[in-house]
Structures are given as C-alpha cells and as structure tokens.
Regions:
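Acidic, serine/proline-rich low-complexity intrinsically disordered regions
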Residues: 5-173
Length: 173
C-alpha cells in the first residue's frame, strides 16, 4: 500500500487544498468496509447522493460508505452501477424532468458517459486520505483552478504530453 500520509503531506505542502483529499475505493462486498465507517441509511436514517458523502468525508473527516440502499440520486446510482440503466435515463427524459436541461442534450451526452457495471460493487467508500485504512483505487482532490494547474504540471513534468479530460456538466460522480 502506498504511504497515504506522505502523499497527503505532499499535497498539503504543494497545493494546500481547502478540504481533505479523499481516498476512494469501490468495494465488491460489505466485508471490505472498515470497522469504523458511517453509512447514511444505517447511521443517519438518510438516503444521500454520493456527492454528499464525498462532502461529508472531505469537510468533516468522516469515513463514508454508500451502497444502493443509501443512494438518493438515481443518476449517480446508475453511474456507480448500483441501479440498472433505464430507458428514460438514456433518452434524457428523466434529466429533463429533474430540471437538468433539455432532453435532446442528455440524449447526446448520456450514452457517452462512463459507468460501472451494474451489480459489480456493493459500496462506494470515501475517507480522508490521511486517515484511510484501505488502499485507494483513486485519490480525489477538490481544488481551485490554480491548484489543479499545479497538480497537472506535477503529473506531466517527467513524462510530458497533455492531460485529457471529459465532462458533461452533470452526473459527474
């Protein structure tokens, strides 16, 4: 496992994000979850979107696990593989009804979005990087544009090239 505390210290030294960088892992079973974890439905009596679980982890320092029973956002549920991909989501009907923009825009965008295989994972796990007790598959950093620029420069310094990214302006979890 990489030295997460050292990575966290380097991020704080060179970028100083306003909230905790997060260790993220998709778990295939509940047995992979750490002993001390907050689950929205079980511990708070709430269903929340994955993006709010990220906010709780990065702002409050909580280790959060979100499974299908916790997920309040149907779009995030599909992206994370917790819910089946429904026709109304593919053609943009559900997004338009939710006030996310015109149906035709989403009909073009939604099929291009990456999504995880339905049923493959049981939980999304998010924890502040410096307290994570698991090996992350991804490190998530919320940052300002200048900080993102610094991270990109650091990534490309040795290898060169460009960093390519894609965004749809929604359903970004």
């Amino acid at each position: 496992m990489p030295d997460l505390k050292a990575i966290n210290e380097a991020l704080n030294l060179h970028c100083r994000p306003q909230t905790f960088p997060l260790a993220i892992r998709m778990c295939q079973s509940a047995q992979e979850l750490p002993e001390r974890v907050r689950m929205p439905k079980r511990d708070m009596g709430l269903r929340i979107p994955a993006c709010q679980a990220f906010s709780m982890a990065r702002r409050y320092g909580w280790t959060m696990a979100v499974g299908p029973e916790d997920q309040a956002c149907p779009f995030g549920g599909v992206i994370l593989g917790f819910l089946k991909y429904k026709p109304g989501l593919i053609d943009g009907t559900l997004q338009e009804q939710a006030g996310m923009g015109p149906k035709d825009r989403w009909a073009k965008s939604t099929p291009l979005m990456a999504r995880l295989e339905y049923g493959k994972y049981s939980h999304l796990l998010a924890s502040p990087l410096h307290t994570a007790t698991f090996e992350p598959q991804l490190i998530l950093i919320y940052a300002m544009p200048g900080q993102i620029g610094r991270l990109i420069q650091g990534t490309l310094y040795e290898r060169g090239g460009v960093l390519t990214a894609a965004s749809s302006g929604g359903m970004a979890c």
